[in-house]
């Protein structure tokens, strides 16, 4: 059974209202979790809108989306455990709507590092 909900505005009884554009634009559209520590990454352990992941070397992966963003102005956030930092880069030298490069590094020297339990979230408008 298929259904449709049509709403232009969400209204709260005491907090006012909000147009649904904010909800649609602001939700996570691509997310994932992977472990790179001591292994070649070939898949995500959990994901949304992910078509593939490529292990480019130490602390360097590229994630590809099933459905692309409508532009390259999407937002990114990520984290990893064990004294690491997650950085987002341009896949192939320039930001693209269909892929994002993720770099994991140590917090002390910013050297490339293979960290476990790395997660990322990207939000923006889908094409």
Name what the model sees in each region.
Residues 68-81:
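Short, surface-exposed, low-complexity cationic segments
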Residues 2, 30-33, 87-94:
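A generic short-segment signal for beta-strand/edge and adjacent turn/coil regions
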């Amino acid at each position: 059974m298929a259904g449709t909900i049509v709403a232009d505005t969400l209204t709260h009884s005491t907090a006012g209202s909000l147009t649904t554009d904010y909800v649609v634009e602001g939700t996570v559209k691509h997310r994932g979790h992977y472990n790179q520590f001591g292994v070649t990454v070939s898949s995500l352990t959990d994901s949304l809108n992910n078509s593939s992941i490529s292990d480019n070397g130490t602390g360097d992966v590229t994630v590809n989306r099933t459905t692309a963003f409508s532009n390259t102005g999407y937002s990114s956030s990520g984290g990893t455990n064990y004294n690491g930092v997650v950085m987002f880069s341009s896949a192939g030298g320039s930001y693209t709507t269909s892929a994002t490069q993720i770099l994991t590094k140590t917090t002390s020297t910013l050297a490339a590092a293979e960290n476990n339990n790395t997660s990322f979230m990207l939000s923006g408008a889908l094409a």
